[in-house]
């Protein structure tokens, strides 16, 4: 692990919202007087009725309940748009940068207001009411922001599904939350390639019930099928409605959105976030972590299909009256300079991306970066997975020219916002460390038995205190919420991540400790990939583990046992990769498939994943005790035929 320390640049300590002394003072208050601290933070948003009850939380077994600001009344869209209009009507709210470098648009707060009202009125005329669910399956185009904010405006609950997910995954998510309306596009554009979104929706709706309307945005003009009794063109419907739409009065704990995330079981979990606590926390973390000041141009490269896009493209920045950049494309199209050209074109000050992108661009060498200016950049950020020190150093030295601090942020879909992070004016940096907890966050490291580990140590990361941005439940399944997050270590939120704390009290996230793989910063449940493989007629059994991958952080390694009489071939290997892409989406494509006559199982039939992980990591010498296996000889075959063998 790198132990090089980067001091806070003097000018940052001077201009930042928070320096080291202020961090210590604010953190101490957030722990000693949480009610007073969060009551003060709640003033950063507009309320129709200000809250008098601040925190009402229980992590007790059988009684997990999380409520913040519960008697307050507000509207999230009002806070992201309307309240800025008197001062910022003509300020750019969203800079949209298309997949094609020649396409970009500036959308002012006034234009955003009008477009969101149009979208909200379209939904209202289709009988969408407060509490109804709307599934959004869109590319990174402005209409994705309009759709999310329109739902917030009228009190509908949005469920955004990443536009890379397959029809089956989409159908699963539509059915789980019983959406009434889908908002999609004819096609998406990504890296110059078209993505058949409307066709995917049509295929999904063959397996999903209860959808009354499909609103279709014309993105490419490609030929699609339209069902005249169900489908409507967005541009035609928008021409029929006004640009005024009153906001719904929402209670603080009314749901804002559902976002599905992979769990260690096959069924995706609908993570439910509510209105006030989420918004306060997203806005506050955006201000302090990115040291946002009026006039900054801020770019988070995530997709709105993930929580990072929800919190740090949309809700956090817009609540703060910021200018936020929304990017339709990919880092390497049309070439490896794309990110840096966009930074120069739009004079971006703050840049927040994933280690996967950094590692991929690092492989292309320094030249594509160095031929651009990047003079506007002041701050860099990293999100989605731990960043290895080598990639951190390259990001700092080459992209940031040794002058931009890096905020290496740790958080989850479930947490709503950033939990462990440097603050650029306060925290000395160590490459690869997420450093220290944000205000109100109390990390605790425990061993497998739940014993609290003090000082310099390694173990499982728990959180002992609630914070306003945390999820409230798994949609429709509170028992699963308790079981997943609060049953492993009673009275504590278990993150599922391993963690090391060093002698300076800095936190280093070491990766998942449950059956979840972090691929390119996105969580993929091993059970989900296994289920997809076993659904293939030639597959009898499958086991999936993660392995270290130079670009993605973790790759997907699948062990597949075939049906009797089926021969393993290279063609079948390719067919299975294609099959998984179709079942779940490209993000779940196995990097390695090893055909295995048998899997290592205990006598009770449990697959020993520890052994499979070591083989996938090409560490056959550290398999540990295999004597408890029903058939230890299985391991020899797996070791001999491993796909990741390093060349001698």
Swiss-Prot record:
Family matches, as Pfam families: ACAS_N (PF16177), AMP-binding (PF00501), AMP-binding_C (PF13193)
Superkingdom, taxonomy of origin: Bacteria
Protein's name according to its UniProt entry: Acetyl-coenzyme A synthetase
GO terms under biological process: acetyl-CoA biosynthetic process; acetyl-CoA biosynthetic process from acetate
Result of changing residue 414 to Q: Great decrease in activity
GO molecular function, one term: AMP binding
Gene that this polypeptide is encoded by: acsA
Family of the protein in this entry: Belongs to the ATP-dependent AMP-binding enzyme family.
Binding-site residues, ATP: 384-386, 408-413, 497, 512, 523
Catalytic activity field: acetate + ATP + CoA = acetyl-CoA + AMP + diphosphate
Residue ranges that the Swiss-Prot or TrEMBL entry lists as coiled coil: none
Amino acids binding Mg(2+): 534, 536, 539
Cysteine disulfide links: none
Enzyme nomenclature, EC number: 6.2.1.1
